[in-house]
Amino acid sequence: MWLALLHALHLPYLVAGAALWCGAALLAAFAFSPLWRKKRPEQGRVLTLALFAALAFLPSSWAAYTLRVYRDNIFPALCLYFFAGMAGMALRAVFEKDKPLWPWLAAAGAGLTCGYLDREDAGLFLLPFAAAATVIVALVLVGKRRWKAFAAQVIPYAMLGVGVLTFCTLNYTHYGVFALSDFSEGSFAAAMGAMMRVDTDSDKPYLSVPADAREKIYEAVPELKPVAYWLEEDAQMENDFRDPGLDDYRAGSFYWAIRRAAQYEGIYADAQTAANYWQTVADKINAACDAGTLPSRTGKRVATSQPITAAYVPATLAETWNGFRHVLGFRDCAPYEALRSIGTDDDIAAWSGYLHCGFNAAANAGEDTPYYSPYQRAIFAVMQGWAWVYGVVLTVCVFCAVVFQLMKLLSCLRKKCTAETVVPWLLLFGIFGIALLRCAMIAFVEVSSFGIGTSTMYLAPVHPLLVLYVFAGLFLYGRPISVKRKDNA
């Protein structure tokens, strides 16, 4: 929908993406402005501008991976709209009692709805923060008897419900299936969950449905035998999806491989046929597992992801730490692509015309590497230098912000605190916690399904959260202790 909108409005893809990101950065800067309400107006404006600049010039926003024509290009901005809306609402509920909250709730709802529709894992990332913020602010509003503001807390969830129902209705109208996605929910997810139930002799962590489990399933479910040829014998399928090191399909590629095999067999002739087919597969596998005909290692599941087990915990924790360090250092944030495009001239022309945006298809003479002019290389060098400096500063500041916030917690435990003290502390704690949650989510997928290495593309929503945490945390709690003692004297 985003690409179609840009095409209809004749907006260049890269320009529109940058505008979306800058809009989110501006909203976030104004969202946190109540924190410096006691500063002189000119100082407050400087702080707001500084936060906007820190977000707008994030190296992750121009990284080659995040500039791809892909849903993750806009996902960080959509998430930032959501977090900015919730933060702006929470801070105004405490510090600006005469200001309406609904505009901030509407902004949060727009970010939540669009983010949820953009990525299937957005609910696990955004909804915990939304729920916690809503409960905390609701307690504050009830205590102050602000009933209209309390009732307005439903706005983000109502917008999310309307957005999801609208898409489900459109899918039902056009395809005959009332679902938001035919991948992460419904009959295909049920079929994948059923296949992952079948026990296996393999102990390789990346394999969700190993070869020995597939052989058992083919025998128990005749409907899958037509796709077995494509999965087990077709050379092109194996080249596209099979891991040569494992000599099998990783979890992160198997579901795409079996969907393509089903497409080749005409199962995706229409959505209803595909839905019925996968539901039949799911029902037969689950029935065989329940009856003992097929060996089962889990209960009934509806999911495309691997089941969470204790075996993944050490690797997930280690990869979470790797991902967090990856974010702090702005690694893999080069603003250019090191590999030359494999697109044909006709493909590139078609995409360029649709997106109103130029593509670089030039190669260095005698090499299979992309060509960049000396001017471009100079700009890239400046941008990478900025990323290096930003990474060092962010790493130091995150450490300091965590220490100062913990010191503030210790001081709050020794005395009675008001909502003006507690809510900002909890807000920053939530922002930092949700950043770690995102790192952990991506870490689990990496160690259980993908095996592609730590990816900036999937971690890009974390960078702005750490910037918000550092900027607000150091402003609130980062004054030297000696100054605070002098103020209290």
Task: Describe the role of every protein-language-model region.
Residues 82-103:
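Membrane-interface transmembrane helices that cradle and orient dolichyl/undecaprenyl
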Residues 15-42, 48, 81-85:
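Transmembrane-helix motifs of polytopic, lipid-linked glycan transferases
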Residues 23-34, 380-424, 478:
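Hydrophobic, aromatic-rich transmembrane alpha-helices
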Residues 16-20, 54-86, 114-131, 459-461:
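Multi-pass, polyprenyl lipid-linked donor-dependent membrane glycosyltransferases
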Residues 1-18:
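Short hydrophobic/aromatic helix or loop-helix immediately within or flanking a transmembrane segment
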Residues 160-316:
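Juxtamembrane membrane-water interface segments immediately following transmembrane helices
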Residues 104-119, 160-167:
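Membrane-interface alpha helices of multi-pass inner-membrane proteins
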Residues 43-47, 98-104, 142-159, 483:
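Membrane-interfacial entry segments at the cytosolic side of transmembrane helices
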